UniProtKB/Swiss-Prot annotation:
GO terms for cellular component: plasma membrane; proton-transporting ATP synthase complex. This is ATP synthase subunit beta. Produces ATP from ADP in the presence of a proton gradient across the membrane. The catalytic sites are hosted primarily by the beta subunits. InterPro entries: AAA+_ATPase, ATP-synt_VA_C, ATP_synth_F1_bsu, ATPase_a/bsu_AS, ATPase_alpha/beta_chains, ATPase_F1/V1/A1_a/bsu_N, ATPase_F1/V1/A1_a/bsu_N_sf, ATPase_F1/V1/A1_a/bsu_nucl-bd. GO terms for molecular function: ATP binding; ATP hydrolysis activity; proton-transporting ATP synthase activity, rotational mechanism. It comes from Shewanella denitrificans (strain OS217 / ATCC BAA-1090 / DSM 15013). It catalyses: ATP + H2O + 4 H(+)(in) = ADP + phosphate + 5 H(+)(out). HAMAP family: ATP_synth_beta_bact (MF_01347). Belongs to the ATPase alpha/beta chains family.
Amino acid sequence: MSTGTVVQVIGAVVDVEFPQDAVPQIYDALKITGEGACKGLVLEVQQQLGGGVVRTIAMGSSDGLRRGLEVVNTGSPISVPVGVATLGRIMNVLGEPIDECGEIGEEERYVIHRSAPSYEDQSSSTELLETGIKVIDLVCPFAKGGKVGLFGGAGVGKTVNMMELINNIAKAHSGLSVFAGVGERTREGNDFYYEMKDSGVLDKVAMVYGQMNEPPGNRLRVALSGLTMAEKFRDEGRDVLLFVDNIYRYTLAGTEVSALLGRMPSAVGYQPTLAEEMGVLQERITSTKSGSITSVQAVYVPADDLTDPSPATTFAHLDATVVLSRQIASLGIYPAVDPLDSTSRQLDPQVVGQEHYDVANGVQTVLQRYKELKDIIAILGMDELSDEDKTAVARARKIERFLSQPFHVAEVFTGSPGKYVSLKDTIRGFKGLLEGEFDHIPEQAFYMVGTIDEAVEKANKKK
């Protein structure tokens, strides 16, 4: 173990000088050993500048750091605890417990920088994962072992949707979950912990948090720490769920680190290595012949612009994309999923079956027609439409409302109990709507209900 000294501190970037014959390797973890507030602070080597000097990024607050402090090279990258000891615990990027429940007591640690599984080891599955959320199960179904992105601007419900997915899948799935909070609000991390505790599934979830107030190095690596824990469960032959909130903050942390390291920015100020950094993370989130990782990632969309380099780079890696729309949210329809923009590789008659495919296609066709007619209705009114178009508009409005659904995790502020709708009931309901079975029921009856039977019951009560 070689020792060096701090020679320069610029915010989160720290330059450390080592003897010429003992220069640390890229990604090695260094530890500050000197006395003071910074004792034990971990630095990760990013660049070798020559002359024995390495440039590092601090994994914690650099307050109190000064030149001349002694630094020890640990000789390996950052490692985190893995295995069953991590379940029910909250850890930081270094795998240290932050829930005041004592030591983790792990039997094994893995380094967070690992290579993705080889082509031979990877496997793909077409088995569907039912979420109980109508719009998702119908239009953009998830695959077991697939990657899903929840795209949306600020305040359209990414985190609430993710919480509902965790609530529905983690409980029904009864497998293990890993939650990586990357640069999000501490309050949300706190809510999530108590949500899991109250519902009795905390002992099946490992949580890794690197929240908004953390330095960029911490936020850049916390997703890898969470993923490493998920990989261990997968390699043991289990099916594991990985939730990442928010993948955009991972990109943003990369941008901050890149600027601090003095790299020339590329489009819109992002780091020049954006695609590579995203690939390093996403290629590891995959299923192998031994087990599967099903991942759900929230993706913040800056200024609601899906062509922004960060969400655009993420799109390429996903099997299903759930796009949340501000327009739909403004109509009071939640979840605010855009059924015309959301896609899934699984929506194929050979995977989901002909009936499901036809119903999903029919719903999209009717909604697309309504979208096209909106301008005519705004200018000339409904009376100018043909009878066929009037029927299409009436059905589309009912479908729009029927795509809404009360969530379990939102019971506190909506006051209505959450609903889990099976795929069979979802298809039956939308098929009936498309075939005109419910043309006699007013559209208000379809708003915020679970199954179609509830809508019929609601309409009968109002009579």
